[in-house]
């Protein structure tokens, strides 16, 4: 997690250093199409549907006019868990640049079979976790962006192939810069919370450049 004071410091740096905060889906579409992004382009993402995103993060983003993406796990939302966002709160955030994408229903370890579970049953459960969120987002918010953040950053070749076949862009939790040659079934992101919340180290990440490998 990141404190409100730290998050404010991060957002102030983006503003004062003239970073261009872009909607994630649009930035990715432009990167894949080979369209040049603005100088110092960045996108802001959150994982999980915790309510403090609305209560503490959203006012800071709204004040600065920054778009953002929240990868939500819909299970706690549908259950009315008071620690998680409501659909009404998400609709409000949508009006001010918020975008909500797939983080599965129950935030499972995607590569872990449950006790006594067959491989076939595991695969049915995992694909249902992903597809059910797409349906919920479309029903509740009018759209389901074709983006999925893997819980705990975990995926494998089979899951990545499934995601790609559905036209979904996948995100892990490894660090790195996104560019046209990136693996869009397992894109990197830079963390900015917990041990990674210090502004000094965040500045280094924000100014990183891709280093493509050429055969």
Name what the model sees in each region.
Residues 154-171:
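Short, electropositive alpha-helical surface patch
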Residues 46, 167-176:
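Acidic, His- and aromatic-enriched active-site or binding-groove loops in soluble protein domains
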Residues 155, 175-208:
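A cross-kingdom marker for long, charged
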Residues 1-42, 189, 197, 204-215:
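N-terminal pre-catalytic segment of deacetylase/amide-hydrolase enzymes
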Residues 24-27, 71-73, 103, 173, ...:
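Conserved beta-strand termini and adjacent loop/short-helix elements that scaffold enzyme active sites
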Residues 1, 17, 32, 37-42, ...:
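Metal-dependent polysaccharide deacetylase catalytic core of the NodB/CE4 family, i.e.
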């Amino acid at each position: 997690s990141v404190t409100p004071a730290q998050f404010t410091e991060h957002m102030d740096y983006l503003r004062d250093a003239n970073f261009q905060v872009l909607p994630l889906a649009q930035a990715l579409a432009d990167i894949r199409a080979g369209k040049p992004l603005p100088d110092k382009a960045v996108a802001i993402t959150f994982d999980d549907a915790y309510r403090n995103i609305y209560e503490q993060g959203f006012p800071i983003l709204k004040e600065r006019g920054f778009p953002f993406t929240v990868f939500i796990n819909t299970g706690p939302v549908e259950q009315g868990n008071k620690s998680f966002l409501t659909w009404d709160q998400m609709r409000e955030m949508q009006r001010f640049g918020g975008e909500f994408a797939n983080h599965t229903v129950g935030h499972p370890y995607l590569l872990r079979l449950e006790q006594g579970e067959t491989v076939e049953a595991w695969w049915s459960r995992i694909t249902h976790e992903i597809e059910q969120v797409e349906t919920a987002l479309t029903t509740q918010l009018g759209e389901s962006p074709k983006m999925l953040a893997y819980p705990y950053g975990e995926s494998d070749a089979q899951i990545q192939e499934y995601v790609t076949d559905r036209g979904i862009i996948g995100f892990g939790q490894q660090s790195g810069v996104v560019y046209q040659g990136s693996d869009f079934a397992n894109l990197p992101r830079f963390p900015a919370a917990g041990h990674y919340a210090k502004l000094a180290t965040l500045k280094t990440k924000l100014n990183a450049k891709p280093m493509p490998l050429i055969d």
